[in-house]
Amino acid sequence: MELEQSFIALIEQSIKTNWYLNALTDYKGITLQYRDVARKIEKIHILLENAGIEKGDKIAICGRNSAHWTVTYLAVITYGAVVVPILHEFKADQVHNIVNHSEARLLFVGDQIWENLNEAAMPHLEGIIELKDFEIGRASCR
């Protein structure tokens, strides 16, 4: 438990110390400053809280490496939930199996992957959120 708190404190200190500096950049895409990262983490924390996510619940992330993927990862672990990272190269049936086997409650997903997924194949999933803008995807939270 102490390691977890130390890690979260390190992230918080890094954000506070570097508030106006660039933190994450997508290749030929967006650049987020540390303050942007903090604000997005806070918004995801609110989303997780409103979805009834509790410490230890599993949250799956499937998407290409990006600033938003990283923000989502940081938000989930600092919230106290467990990240289930899924490679974006996996086929839809593999993603379905991992989501189901892990008992993930939510799935953050890149739009390229979402197009190939079948919500009905993940019956226990409570919601799908798009990584590009953190909006509730075509599947809404139950």
Language-model features, listed with the residues they occupy:
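Structural core segment of the AMP-binding/adenylate-forming
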Residues: 10, 50-51, 78-140
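Hydrophobic/aromatic residues within well-ordered alpha-helical segments
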Residues: 7, 14, 40-41, 121
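Conserved AMP-binding/adenylate-forming core of the ANL superfamily
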Residues: 3, 12, 20-74, 91-96
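Flexible, low-complexity linker/hinge segments
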Residues: 1-5, 135-142
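N-terminal amphipathic/basic helix or basic patch
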Residues: 2-13, 108
